[in-house]
UniProtKB/Swiss-Prot annotation:
One of its GO terms (biological process) is negative regulation of proteolysis. A motif (Secondary area of contact) lies at residues 46-50. Pfam families: Cystatin. The modification N-acetylmethionine is found at residue 1. The gene is CSTB. This is Cystatin-B. It is found in: Cytoplasm. SUPFAM superfamilies: Cystatin/monellin. The record marks 4 as: Reactive site.
């Protein structure tokens, strides 16, 4: 993977689901609602001074959100940050940089 270029879209893994779960409360606070369903479906990663993860998350039968999560470098010891998100996405909406 090239520094700065997002990876190809990949199926979500247990690690990606765990990351999505860790920022779920940040999204719920920003949206002022709870998401009983929160299933990571696919993701892209981008190496920066740390790592950006673009994660497609299913929040209802036909409703998805796209998350951009920043993971700092290990020696910085900082928590995961929900940098940005997009709501009202469908299963077929492509994950792109936002």
């Amino acid at each position: 993977m090239m520094c700065g270029a997002p990876s190809a879209t990949q199926p979500a893994t247990a690690e990606i689901q765990a990351i999505a779960d860790k920022v779920k409360s940040q999204l719920e606070e920003k949206e002022n609602k709870t998401f009983p369903v929160f299933k990571a479906v696919e993701f892209k990663s981008q190496v920066v001074a740390g790592r950006n993860l673009f994660i497609k998350v299913q929040v209802d039968d036909d409703d998805f959100v796209h998350l951009r999560v920043f993971e700092s470098l290990p020696h910085e010891n900082k928590p995961l940050t929900l940098s940005s998100y997009q709501t009202n996405k469908s299963r077929h909406d492509e994950l792109t940089y936002f």
